[in-house]
Each structure stands twice: as structure tokens, then as C-alpha cells.
Amino acid sequence: SALPYFLNKPIAQLAHDEGVHYFDLTEDVSTTKFIQNLGATSEAVLAPQCGLAPGLIGIIGMDLTYSFDQIRDIELRVGALPRYPNGQLAYSFTWSPHGVINEYLNDAEAIHNGQKKFVPSLEGFEYINIEGQEFEAFTTSGGLGTLCDTFEGKVDTLNYKTIRYPGHGKLMRFLMYELILKNDKEQLERILSNAKPPVEEDVVYVYAVVEGWQNKTLSRKEYYKAFHPIEIEGKKWRAISWTTAASLVAVIELVAAGVLPQKGFLKQEEIPFKKFLETPTGALFL
């Protein structure tokens, strides 16, 4: 399912009842919890969150942890942005406005001081410099998938933040909380979609860092890549489009090849990054 998050529960239920594999791109926490509960009695694979974040970023973050004897911090960052921004929002809605608004409004899961908790979205601002370009990052919901469940009690810090051009988060807070548009999501969606239509030239930034101890020495591992539009079989794909689609298709290829479990709920962090990259579609990320 590539449908908006609020349509996925009945589709997942139908897949469960019919015993067929299910994959989606949802970032919605409650939808994922619903599907996770279905997984206990599923005779086929139920794999939500197969996009970028949640999805690929969790696979990458988990892969970095294998270098450590003990993990201290896991910090994951993803941004899908116009390559040539304009206006104060400096953004373009190249994916579901429903999803963007949902992840800006809902609280985000995180682990802080070893404890799993919920933190407000559009908070925790930090500034990032990527190859000389300044960005901001702030908390948004859903990006960690099931990682908080996996690492609760095992790490001091685990968080996910969305990368944006500076000033974007403050303006979104103004729209949602000062103008109270958080209570009228349909109007907010219309305003944003009309003001910031999709662009052809976009970029996806993927950044993950893990800190911990190797042989009693504190060290740090990082992954960073910027993905741009590419041509696939004669058709140009936006960066957000092909990276999202390829993340999902690579997981399908792994299930079809028997590399992954054939039934039950599938966590993204259970997918080996090396095997992911070895699939025909996953190889696009090399």
C-alpha cells in the first residue's frame, strides 16, 4: 500500500485475513501498532514502514550498531527537500501532505536517558552542516519505526529528526499552533499543497550516527549519502520517489527470495543492510 496512512488498517486486516503478504510506506505509529498486533496470528509477512523513514534509515542505523560491543547513542536524520528552495518555507510537497502534517503533529517516540518516552514533534531543534550547506533538524513522529521497542533499556539515547532548510520548523509551528490550523488539517493541507507543489529537482539526505564502545574504546560510526533524481528505464524519477519506492521493492525482493521470514510482523531493523543492497533494486542505493 502506498495510500495515505489512515487507509492502511483495513488493507492490512484484509491481507492478514487472506493470508497474503503486506507491505506499506506508513509513518503512522498507531497504524504500525495495529499491524504489529495482527502479526501474532498472520500466516504471511506483514511489513509496514518500508519507505525512507521509517524504513531504510532504520536498516542503516541497525547495521552501524553491529560494530559495537556496547551502544550509547543512535541518532538518525533524513530530509527530502527541493534542491533549489525558494520562499520562507523552503519546502516542496513531493510526498503525501497527509503524511507530512501527521508527522509534524503527533508526538515522537524516543529513548532519553535510557527510558522510552514520547516527545513533542517540531521540537529539539539542532543545526547541521552538510557539505557547506546549513540545515536544521527537529523531531517528527514515526521515523524510528519499531527501534524504540528494540533498543529500550539497551541505549542511553535514540532519536529521529527530520532535516529541513533553516526557518521551516518555526513557520510550521506558527501555522499549526498560533493560527490553530492543527485543528483543521484539511485546510492546512490545502494551503500547503497550493503554496508548495512538487518540484522535479529534489534531493534526499540520509544521515545516521551510532556511538558506543569497541574493545572498551569509545568510538563513532557514521553513514551519510545524498540521493538525487535518476533515470530508470528511460523515465526520470524524483529523488523522493525512487528512494521510497526502491526501499519497499528491495524488501519485497528479499521476502520473495526467502532471505527474510515468510510470516509474521517484520521489523525494518531485522533486514540486513548488506542483503538489502544485494537486491536488484537495493543496488540503486550504492
Q: What do these predicted regions represent?
A:
Residues S1-N8:
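Rossmann-like NAD(P)-binding element
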Residues S42-P82:
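Adenosine-phosphate binding glycine-rich loop
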